[in-house]
Amino acid sequence: MLREPMNQHDAPGPAETGADSDAETDAETDAETDAGAADDRYRLSHNSQIGTVLRDLAWQKCMLSVRTRTAHQFVTSILHVDPVNRTFVFDWCNAEPERMSLMTSEENAFSGLLRGVPVNFVVGQPAATRYDDGPAFVAEFPEKLYHFQRRRHFRARTLVTKGYRCEMSLPDKTVLGLDIADLSLSGVGLRSRTVTADHLPVGTTVAKCRLDFRELGKLELDMQVVGHWLVGRDDSAIHHFGCAFVNPDGRMENFLQRLVFALELAHRG
């Protein structure tokens, strides 16, 4: 047990149905969760830079989550990138509600992982096209694309059976509870089946988030959501959020370092 838990709190997280099942995939275990804050350091706005990332996503056959303005979601992948005309082609959606929502939405948010690093961008209304004799969508390049840098610190994964939880109180008094997936000195990875990007859009800053590591201690600090991605499909999908700590003080960083070490020992144990 760590001897100096910071900011003790007795308030438990809201009663979600236990910890999410340990249905990790390679994408989940490699997911980046402690990228730096979502600011201009990670924003790409030149077409050549955006095109390079889109081509990499296509080359790596990365799966991307798409969320329309009406909150419909589906999973797709980029099939082709045209840097001259600044357009890209992505895979068709067979589900009619999601497809119709996409084609009538002027704001469609893409999120995914490129070599374990979160990528986020928003495009306008796409059009139907053909690619390799099959239906597909074509859209213009986004005006900006966020490509987060790799983590600066070692990340310790948690054991799902431990039930470590994060509780967030939003400005509208909504209280969200998520499972803690991993921890580093600069951020934390959270996951949930019920908390979605509608509740925690990328860029959201939440004050006084409570991290409960049970016998290891409890923390309270400010965090910013810097990444979101889905693992799985339909009802089995798990929402993952990468959150960066906002200005932790020296004493907090010292405790985080010991906590990361303790989590890694438990994970290897």
UniProtKB/Swiss-Prot annotation:
Keywords: Bacterial flagellum, c-di-GMP, Nucleotide-binding. It is found in: Bacterial flagellum basal body. One of its GO terms (molecular function) is cyclic-di-GMP binding. Gene3D superfamilies: Electron Transport, Fmn-binding Protein, Chain A, predicted glycosyltransferase like domains. Its main location: other. Residues 1-42 are annotated as: Disordered. GO terms for cellular component: bacterial-type flagellum basal body. Residues 149-261 form the PilZ domain. Residues 19-33 have a biased composition (Acidic residues). GO terms for biological process: bacterial-type flagellum-dependent cell motility; regulation of bacterial-type flagellum-dependent cell motility by regulation of motor speed. InterPro entries: PilZ_domain, Split_barrel_FMN-bd, T3SS_YcgR, T3SS_YcgR_PilZN. It holds the Pfam family PilZ. Monomer. Interacts with the flagellar basal bodies. Acts as a flagellar brake, regulating swimming and swarming in a bis-(3'-5') cyclic diguanylic acid (c-di-GMP)-dependent manner. Binds 1 c-di-GMP dimer per subunit. Increasing levels of c-di-GMP lead to decreased motility. Belongs to the YcgR family. This is Flagellar brake protein YcgR.
